[in-house]
Amino acid sequence: AATATDGENTVLSLFATYTDQGATGLKPLSSAATVNLRSNIFNARELTERTRIALKDSTNSGFLVYPENNGWLKLNKIDLSGISHIELMNLSKGEAGNYTIELRLDSEKGLLIGKGNFIDNGTFNLQKNASISIKPVIDRKLHDLHIHIVSDSKNVKQRPLIRSIKFIPAKLL
């Protein structure tokens, strides 16, 4: 059976059971397993572990405000197997700025697995995504992902907003 919840924190839960008939002198075999699959899109409101990155929630849709100087946010227990890059869905608030984005494993100073830039040209309400390639993570473990954002342009008052973060899988050959 498959179930999914509506709204944020969407998880697909797959539950399966198996029982055979057994045979003369043998007990039936049975087993059960559950797998929970998270959505590959995290909305801004779901990203609660952050430093110097504020939540702007006046529209009931939730956005994260890029930091004035630097800041980070953290996603817990993410399986990055098969992920080639992430996309930050951004919305300009009308003032130009340049931002450096780093992706680190398990801690603020952890292994650097991706680095990119977001250049906000200052066009008000323009949606522009920042795509950052990720070095392959092949250990099949769950990791905490730290996303560091550094503003190259200081004193920007109308900083861009993050609507969501999307994990993009590698293309299969």
Residue ranges with predicted function:
Residues 1-173:
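Extracytoplasmic
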